[in-house]
C-alpha cells in the first residue's frame, strides 16, 4: 500500500493523492510511504519517480548493509530498524529529493507510524522532507536503547543467578545474549558510519544547517556502540568465570575421587595378597588372622583419611 502526504502552499496537508498528481501539482513537498507494496506499486519507483535501478534493486533485496548512495536528483539511504521487543531486524529505505521523501519497507514500521503521528499533530509549517528524515533516524536510533538496556538486565540476572539455574542453562542464555549483541553491533556500526558521513558531507546542502541535530543522533549511536562493546566484554568475563568455576569444581571432584582411590589402594593390595590360593600362608591358619587383617586395613584407611583431611583435601 502507498500512503501519500503532500503539503500545499498554504501549509495544508493533503493525504492519499495519486503520486502523479502530487509530482505534477503545486506542492511544497511530499512524503510517499511504500508500506509493504505489491508489484504494481513497486513499479511507481520506476515511473513516475524514475529512481535508479540499483536503488530499486536494493529495496527489493531486504536487509542490505546500511549505506548512503548519492544520485543526481536524490539521495538514497538504506537503514536498519530493530523491534525493541523481538530484536527482529528490518530494513527501511529512504529516497530524499529536492521536494519529496519516499520511504519503502517490507513490514509495518513503528518508526514511520510514529513520525506520521508527530507530523499530523504539530505545526506543518515547521516541517520539510528533511525534518521527516531527521525524525525517522532519531526514532530509529532511540529504539535501539531499550534493546541494549534489556540485554544489560539479562546479563545482570545471568551473573547473579537468583533462580539457581544449572550451569548448562546459564551458558545457553549467555551465548544467546552474546548473539543478540553481535546482531545489534552489525546494525549499530554501519548506522553510525552513515550519520557520520551525513555530518561531514556537503552533498546534501540542506543538512549543512542541521548538523547539530545529526550530531546528537551520532552521539546516541556512539553511546549505544560503547554499551554493546562493554556488554560483549561482560559476556566474555561471565563466560570465563563460569568455565573457571566449572573447571575448579571438576578438579575438586577429581581430587576427592583420587583421595578415595588412594585410600583403597593399600586395602586392595592386602585383600589381593591374602586372597591368593597358596597352601603355605601361616597367617591364614591363625585363628585371629582374619580379625588382625581387618584391624590393619581399618587402621590404614582411617589413618590415611585423617592425614588427607588435615591437609585439606576434603574441603
Segments predicted by a language model, with ranges:
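Hydrophobic alpha-helical transmembrane segments and their immediately adjacent juxtamembrane loops
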Residues: 50, 219-315
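Peripheral, non-transmembrane regulatory/ligand-interaction domains of membrane transport proteins
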Residues: 1-207, 213-216, 220-223, 227, ...
Amino acid at each position: 500500500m502507498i500512503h501519500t502526504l503532500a503539503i500545499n502552499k498554504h501549509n495544508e496537508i493533503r493525504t492519499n493523492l495519486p503520486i502523479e498528481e502530487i509530482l505534477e501539482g503545486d506542492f511544497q513537498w511530499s512524503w510517499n510511504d511504500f508500506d509493504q507494496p505489491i508489484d504494481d506499486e513497486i513499479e511507481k519507483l520506476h515511473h513516475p519517480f524514475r529512481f535508479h535501478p540499483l536503488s530499486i534493486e536494493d529495496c527489493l533485496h531486504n536487509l542490505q548493509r546500511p549505506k548512503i548512495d548519492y544520485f543526481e536528483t536524490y539521495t538514497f539511504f538504506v537503514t536498519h530498524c530493530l523491534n525493541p521487543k523481538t530484536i527482529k531486524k528490518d530494513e527501511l529505505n529512504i529516497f530524499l529529493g529536492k521536494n519529496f521523501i519516499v520511504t519503502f519497507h517490507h513490514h509495518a514500521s513503528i518508526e514511520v507510524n510514529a513520525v506520521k503521528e508527530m507530523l499530523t499533530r504539530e505545526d506543518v509549517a515547521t516541517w520539510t522532507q528533511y525534518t521527516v528524515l531527521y525524525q525517522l533516524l532519531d526514532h530509529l536510533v532511540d529504539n535501539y536503547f531499550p534493546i541494549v538496556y534489556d540485554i544489560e538486565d539479562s546479563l545482570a540476572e545471568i551473573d547473579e543467578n537468583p533462580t539457581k539455574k544449572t550451569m548448562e542453562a546459564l551458558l545457553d542464555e549467555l551465548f544467546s545474549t552474546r548473539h543478540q549483541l553481535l546482531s545489534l553491533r552489525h546494525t549499530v556500526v554501519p548506522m553510525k558510519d552513515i550519520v557520520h558521513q551525513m555530518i561531514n558531507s556537503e552533498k546534501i546542502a540542506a543538512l549543512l544547517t542541521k548538523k547539530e541535530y545529526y550530531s546528537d543522533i551520532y552521539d546516541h549511536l556512539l553511546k549505544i556502540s560503547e554499551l554493546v562493546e562493554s556488554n560483549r566484554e561482560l559476556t566474555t568475563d561471565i563466560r570465563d568465570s563460569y568455565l573457571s568455576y566449572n573447571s575448579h569444581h571438576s578438579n575438586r571432584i577429581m581430587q576427592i575421587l583420587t583421595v578415595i582411590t588412594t585410600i583403597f589402594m593399600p586395602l586392595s593390595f592386602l585383600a589381593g595378597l591374602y586372597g591368593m590360593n597358596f597352601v603355605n600362608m601361616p597367617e591364614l591358619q591363625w585363628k585371629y588372622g582374619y580379625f588382625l587383617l581387618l584391624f590393619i586395613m581399618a587402621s590404614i584407611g582411617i589413618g590415611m583419611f585423617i592425614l588427607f583431611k588435615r591437609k585439606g583435601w576434603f574441603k
